[in-house]
């Protein structure tokens, strides 16, 4: 199946990189458990290029996951409270509303995401190294600032993301011009310090 790809560019040079490097499933081995690795596009000062950077879990992000779950739980409680009480003599189960089904799904998904994030924090609690570039393994890298990707924009113009291109001075931009890629995605295993395990395919 093909997927839309976004392109990073620069306002002052011909830099052009896709975001497809973040695709695929990467995980840490925590004993016999596979713990999902979070990644994002970032800048590696060692590679002097854009690349895939680890995103290490932290307390603030865990709190955000928790609040998201609590929000969905509160909305679901309101929906359930608004339903008329079931008649004792009625033998059939009342059919759930679409809103209730959607909220139950959101609660389940948010609870799963929170549990996975908490497991990642536990697995990496004794980690010594900082987030790494997954191409070269360097810790001298940083994640790009938060930005949106308009995969389905009617007019896909390059949009600055608020990051100066190191060594160039231009502003990095992102846009999606309907280009789609059909790639075979592979799983990649890493140790708890973010190093690719032997036998896995390098970035």
Regions found by a protein language model. Name each.
Residues 1-7, 203:
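His-enriched metal-coordination microenvironments in redox/metal-binding proteins
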Residues 6-59, 63, 67-75, 101, ...:
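Short recognition patches in nucleic-acid-associated and regulatory proteins
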Residues 26, 112-115:
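Generic signal for short, ordered secondary-structure residues
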Residues 70-113, 133:
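Flexible coil/linker segments and helix-coil junctions enriched in charged and small residues
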Residues 123:
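Basic nucleic-acid-binding interfaces
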Residues 181, 187-203:
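Long, compositionally biased interface segments
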């Amino acid at each position: 199946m093909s997927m839309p790809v976004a392109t990073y560019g620069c306002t002052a040079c011909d830099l052009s990189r896709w975001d497809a490097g973040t695709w695929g499933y990467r995980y840490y081995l925590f004993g016999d458990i596979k713990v999902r690795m979070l990644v994002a596009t970032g800048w590696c000062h060692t590679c002097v290029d854009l690349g895939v950077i680890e995103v290490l879990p932290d307390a603030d992000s865990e709190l955000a996951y928790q609040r998201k779950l609590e929000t969905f739980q509160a909305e679901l409680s309101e929906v359930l409270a608004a339903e008329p009480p079931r008649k004792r003599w009625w033998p059939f189960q009342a059919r759930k509303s679409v809103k209730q089904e959607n909220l139950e799904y959101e609660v389940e998904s948010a609870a799963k995401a929170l549990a996975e994030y908490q497991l990642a924090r536990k697995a990496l609690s004794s980690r010594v190294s900082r987030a790494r570039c997954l191409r070269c393994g360097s810790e001298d890298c940083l994640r790009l600032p938060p930005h949106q990707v308009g995969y389905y924009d009617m007019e896909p113009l390059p949009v600055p993301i608020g990051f100066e291109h190191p060594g160039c001075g231009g502003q990095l931009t992102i846009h999606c011009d309907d280009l789609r890629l059909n790639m075979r995605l592979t799983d990649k295993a890493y140790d708890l310090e973010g190093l690719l395990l032997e036998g896995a395919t390098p970035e």
